[in-house]
């Protein structure tokens, strides 16, 4: 009988960051069944913010099949792009995001210039 935790992990590093057997999207990630050892690994990573939402005990993995709403939440998290405030990123993180998206920029660009380069890439949301 393992003790499991429901946690929310905030990833501000990059899309697809991996730790403790999980792949994280940018922003908040809700995890339904995290073991004690996985929780310790997540908490040990200074690049992640971990918040425990619930604790419980599981016998053999039955918890996931009993709660289909948790899997729906997980699908919704992955389907909706995370809402991030670009001003919270450092210049290096912005440069990494632009490089991943294939957007070219000057190495001497300021933070404001780098943020402005995201606008054409996120052109779907033109209405306020």
Curated annotation (Swiss-Prot):
Pfam family, one: FluMu_N
Residue ranges, annotated region (Disordered): 53-87
One Gene Ontology term of the molecular function aspect: DNA binding
InterPro entries: FluMu_N, HeH/LEM_domain, Rho_N_sf, SAP_dom_sf
Top-rank taxon: Bacteria
Subunit structure: Monomer.
Family: To phage Mu protein gp35.
Protein name according to UniProt: Mu-like prophage FluMu protein gp35
